[in-house]
């Protein structure tokens, strides 16, 4: 099925068009000696007209019958193309961007393709418990590969060293997998899920 691109989507977000909307589905999590648990997750990738995607994920544990048991965790962040920032971009702080986007056409965006034919991206994700991750990677068609470039932990936060995340669109389902290195262990499988889009991308400003 062709990927529908919202008519009001800023050119810089066209590579992310297949992710936009709200997704929901089930998966499994575990790590080290922790018991493997089934969960249900709702993920939203939202565009507002600015040149970044707002990401939110809500995870609920399931009981043995597959029914919701209790909330597990949330995370949220921002997905964007990795490129040098210009005077017309947002920031620093609350300083707004220029009314006209820095990248105004598909041709401008195409110039950012990397040697692999994809686009370099940066993804920042904030988790409860005092952990913030900065991922670098690429988006190439309906696939995203990410690896942590930096992890910030608040004093008293649980030990977490690094992570990798993989996202892909398979038969119109969003598949993702997360490996992590934590608690002094090597990078290993942590969680994965298969999600179905339940709401399409909302128009910017809605």
Swiss-Prot record:
Its cofactor is heme b. Heme b binds at residue 190. It catalyses: peroxynitrite = nitrate. GO terms for molecular function: heme binding; metal ion binding; peroxynitrite isomerase activity. Transmembrane segments: none annotated. It comes from the Bacteria. Signal peptide: none annotated. The keyword Iron applies. A motif (GXWXGXG) lies at residues 21-27. Keywords: Heme, Iron, Isomerase, Metal-binding. CDD domains: lipocalin_heme-bd-THAP4-like. Binds 1 heme b group per subunit, that coordinates a highly solvent-exposed Fe(III) atom. Pfam families: THAP4_heme-bd (PF08768). Pathway: Nitrogen metabolism. Its EC number is 5.99.-.-. The keyword Isomerase applies. Belongs to the nitrobindin family. Homodimer. Heme-binding protein able to scavenge peroxynitrite and to protect free L-tyrosine against peroxynitrite-mediated nitration, by acting as a peroxynitrite isomerase that converts peroxynitrite to nitrate. Therefore, this protein likely plays a role in peroxynitrite sensing and in the detoxification of reactive nitrogen and oxygen species (RNS and ROS, respectively). Is able to bind nitric oxide (NO) in vitro, but may act as a sensor of peroxynitrite levels in vivo. Forms a 10-stranded antiparallel beta-barrel structure able to accommodate a hydrophobic ligand in its interior. In fact, this fold hosts the heme group, which is located in a wide surface cleft. This is Peroxynitrite isomerase. The lineage of its organism: Bacteria, Bacillati, Actinomycetota, Actinomycetes, Micrococcales.
């Amino acid at each position: 099925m062709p990927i529908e691109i919202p008519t009001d989507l800023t050119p810089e977000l066209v590579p992310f068009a297949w992710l936009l909307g709200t997704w929901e589905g089930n998966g499994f999590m575990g790590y080290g000696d922790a018991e493997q648990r089934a969960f249900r997750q709702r993920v939203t990738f939202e565009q507002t007209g600015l040149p970044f995607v707002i990401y939110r994920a809500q995870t609920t544990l399931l009981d043995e019958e597959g029914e919701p048991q209790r909330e597990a965790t949330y995370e949220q962040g921002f997905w964007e193309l990795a490129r040098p920032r210009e005077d017309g971009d947002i920031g620093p702080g609350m300083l707004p961007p220029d009314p006209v986007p820095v990248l105004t056409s598909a041709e401008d965006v195409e110039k950012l393709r990397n040697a692999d034919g994809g686009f370099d991206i940066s993804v920042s994700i904030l988790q409860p418990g005092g952990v913030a991750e900065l991922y670098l990677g690429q988006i190439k068609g309906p696939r995203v590969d990410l690896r942590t470039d930096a992890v910030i932990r608040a004093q008293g936060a649980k030990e977490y060293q690094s992570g990798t995340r993989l996202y892909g669109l398979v038969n119109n389902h969003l598949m993702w997998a997360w490996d992590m290195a934590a608690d002094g262990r090597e990078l290993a499988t942590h969680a994965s899920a298969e999600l179905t889009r339940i709401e399409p991308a909302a128009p910017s400003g809605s």
